[in-house]
């Protein structure tokens, strides 16, 4: 036999769960829905125990409202004063309590993911959806916002929406169809060929003929490039970049490079300096070997003939020795 309910309780804690207390407050309303503040007020008016430590049990009650499927949240209509949404019981959880008593629950009410916040019965589902649609339309009308105009093809659920005429510039059709152009506006086919870093085999003869007038010592009568002499085009003579290696370095039967290089001047014979005056050799011969740092060099120079390079350096050595003495 279920325990009889009482309208009021003393300061002791009532034997009801937070779900039972919330459901009791919602069902006591004539509209079967209440805001959160009215739920708090109903519980505190009926059960004096919850008039103390309000923050603790109100937080627990809010968690039960949010994480239990038996409660649904209904937005407030624009014509209703106040703020906050309403909380109501799910239409399918009417038999959640045994014999109408809030002390016992049959089982935890759970809504499937595919049917979340939607009633199981078709009639209740249609009524619930119509009510939600009316609330949203009235809220939009009060706020002054307009629904965006969608094309008719968007509402055709049976067919496929026709693609629009606009195509993204990076679509595959545009990439294939359009002509590749440079940033300056010229196509690749209209560009001039870029000259190679080294002359190609068919350009060596023209380069030699054009440079022959400016380089007579290289492209003279014994020029390095002869138009009558064919240049070898064997596959082994070419590098990985298509530039011939052998014609650039040495042609057949030639010892000088084909590319013009600066030619160093040949050193001419330096004329012999005039003979030293008589007093300087006399002083050098009379000086002792220990005082003359160049006595060994002087003896060597007297025993062997002087070369041109020694002739260039001997006056400086002689003058240095005279200054020391």
From Swiss-Prot:
Gene3D superfamilies: Winged helix-like DNA-binding domain superfamily/Winged helix DNA-binding domain. CDD domains: FH_FOXB2. It is found in: Nucleus. It comes from the Eukaryota. Residues 12-103 bind DNA. Residues 284-309 have a biased composition (Low complexity). Keywords: DNA-binding, Nucleus, Transcription, Transcription regulation. One of its GO terms (molecular function) is sequence-specific DNA binding. InterPro entries: Fork_head_dom, FOX_domain-containing, FOXB1_B2_FH, TF_fork_head_CS_1, TF_fork_head_CS_2, WH-like_DNA-bd_sf, WH_DNA-bd_sf. Residues 284-325 are annotated as: Disordered. SUPFAM superfamilies: Winged helix' DNA-binding domain (SSF46785). It holds the Pfam family Forkhead. GO terms for biological process: anatomical structure morphogenesis; axon target recognition; cell differentiation; cell migration in diencephalon; epithelial cell differentiation involved in mammary gland alveolus development; floor plate development; hypothalamus cell migration; inferior colliculus development. One of its GO terms (cellular component) is chromatin. Transcription factor expressed by neural progenitor cells in specific regions of the embryonic neuroepithelium. Essential for the mammillary nuclei maintenance. Negatively regulates the proliferation of oligodendrocyte progenitors and promotes oligodendrocyte maturation. Also expressed in mammary glands, plays a role in lactation, controls development of mammary glands and the inferior colliculi of the midbrain in the central nervous system that regulates the milk-ejection reflex. This is Forkhead box protein B1. It comes from Homo sapiens. The gene is FOXB1.
